[in-house]
A protein has these predicted regions:
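Mobile active-site "lid"/loop adjacent to the S-adenosyl-L-methionine
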Residues: 307-337
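Conserved class I S-adenosyl-L-methionine
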Residues: 236-245
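Conserved SAM-binding motif I beta-strand of class I
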Residues: 260-265
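Conserved SAM-binding loop of SAM-dependent methyltransferases across substrates and taxa
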Residues: 246-259
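C-terminal catalytic and target-recognition region of SAM-dependent MTase-like enzymes
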Residues: 333, 347-409
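Non-catalytic substrate-recognition/targeting regions of SAM-dependent transferases
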Residues: 111-124, 143-219
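Non-catalytic accessory regions of SAM-dependent methyltransferases
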Residues: 1-127
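S-adenosyl-L-methionine
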Residues: 269-311
Length: 409
């Protein structure tokens, strides 16, 4: 192996070599054939080579994780200085400016981990605030260099960035040996805002975002264009939005001209936020229910409520392979109940945000639910996550969101 650097070398087996050559950036602990005699420092850069010594890439070492190395480059001559990382940020931002509409750039995902070659890092923009989540030790160590560059690159493009807030209260950090925490990142020579709340506008709908306490980084940006698709179908219909969270699909449906929208969620806190968002947008064609969807749908069917468009956007029912079977039963139950509740000719929007609930499994589940409900599905659209959450071929973990629009006949 010939490189211009002198990093510790990890040799991997044929299985890992095949994955890496195919574009995947991870090296698992079990796929390492040999490693340096003196164990390198956690989070340091290491080179990865094949069984024959051919260079495969350079990445961050994680001694606590089963994912032992996360590649950041496949160029043996790269120099990983501040200029390198600045180019990476510029490249990611240029991509967003290309694939998103200008109005969407103030509420978008700026960095999507491995898909942007920042393994384990998420950066979301909410108006003038960047909210980050760091899930790898390599990115954690890089923060003093990388985070100021994030602000620098966006500001150089004329974007107003007032601060960077860290949402590292994620249990996955423990797998990297990292503590959970959240708070403002101290940009050199700057003070941060006092408030941890802001407002964004997406598809012409305003949302209050609590990026300190909201789920994940504060708001789910990946469904932005799917919400727009729902708004188009909703016009003139009576809509039930299950798992509404802070009301995003319901608000788009209401603004899109729905006759009436009911937004339902098991969380009273989420319903309160959805009501606040409805008031902010002056939407009066909305009702709100604090109820478990698994109980709500059978009750509404029994009572004969006249909804002709139902939206199912549940949280991930599975985050591991071992629970996929149970998750698919849950997905089938809510989809079956929705199909039974809808009149023939009604509409169904249904989604899954779990990578492990693959599109193949999801389609199979929908077929089974329709069969049991004695309904047939007329497909309108199959959609996915918004393009600021890019799907990197060879990395199936980046392809996680399934979204289907049907007419139920």
């Amino acid at each position: 192996m010939k490189t211009s650097r002198n990093y510790p070398v990890y040799k991997v087996n044929k299985h890992a070599e095949g994955l890496l050559v195919g574009g995947h950036p991870w090296v698992y602990e079990n796929d390492i054939q040999s490693s340096p005699e003196a164990e390198p420092e956690n989070g340091t850069l290491v080179d990865v080579v094949s069984t024959k010594g051919a260079y495969l890439g350079t990445g961050f070492l994680s001694l606590k994780s089963k994912i032992r190395v996360r590649l950041i480059s496949r160029n043996a001559n790269d120099t990983f200085d501040a200029a390198f990382w600045k180019r990476r940020v510029e490249y990611a931002w240029a991509y967003r400016k290309t694939v998103l509409e200008p109005a969407d750039l103030t509420a978008c995902r700026v960095i999507f981990g491995e898909a942007d070659q920042f393994p384990g890092l998420t950066v979301d923009r909410f108006s003038n605030i960047l909210v980050t989540q760091t899930l790898s030790v390599g990115m954690e160590k890089l923060k003093p260099i990388l985070f100021p560059l994030l602000a620098e690159v966006l500001r150089a493009d004329g974007q107003t960035i007032e601060g960077i807030y860290e949402r590292n209260d994620e249990a996955l950090r423990a797998k990297e040996g990292l503590a959970q925490n959240k708070g403002w990142f101290d940009l050199p020579g700057e003070t941060h805002p006092d408030s941890t709340q802001t407002e964004i506008c997406e598809n012409g709908v305003f949302y209050h975002v609590d990026f300190e306490n909201g789920q994940k980084t504060g708001f789910f940006l990946d469904q932005k264009y799917n919400r727009r698709a729902v708004a188009r179908i909703a016009a003139g219909h009576t809509v039930l939005d299950c798992f509404t969270h802070t009301g995003s699909f319901a608000l788009n449906a209401a603004k899109g001209g729905a006759a009436r929208v009911t937004a339902a969620d098991i969380s009273a806190e989420a319903i309160a936020m959805a009501q606040r968002n409805a008031q902010r947008n002056n939407l009066t064609n909305m009702d709100f229910l604090c109820e478990d969807t698994f109980e709500l749908l059978p009750r509404l069917e029994k009572e004969g409520h006249p909804y002709d468009f139902i939206i199912l956007d549940p949280p991930a029912f599975t985050k591991a392979r071992r629970t996929v079977e149970n998750a698919m039963r849950g997905y089938k139950e809510i989809n079956y109940r929705a199909m039974k509740l809808l009149p023939r000719g009604g509409y169904l929007a249904t989604a899954s945000c779990s990578h492990f609930a693959t599109e193949e499994l999801f389609i199979k589940m929908l077929h089974a639910a329709a069969k049991d409900a004695h309904r047939q599905l007329r497909q309108i659209e199959v959609r996915q996550q918004a393009p600021d959450h890019p799907i990197l071929w060879g990395v199936p973990e980046t392809n996680y969101l399934k979204f289907f629009l049907f007419q139920v006949i």
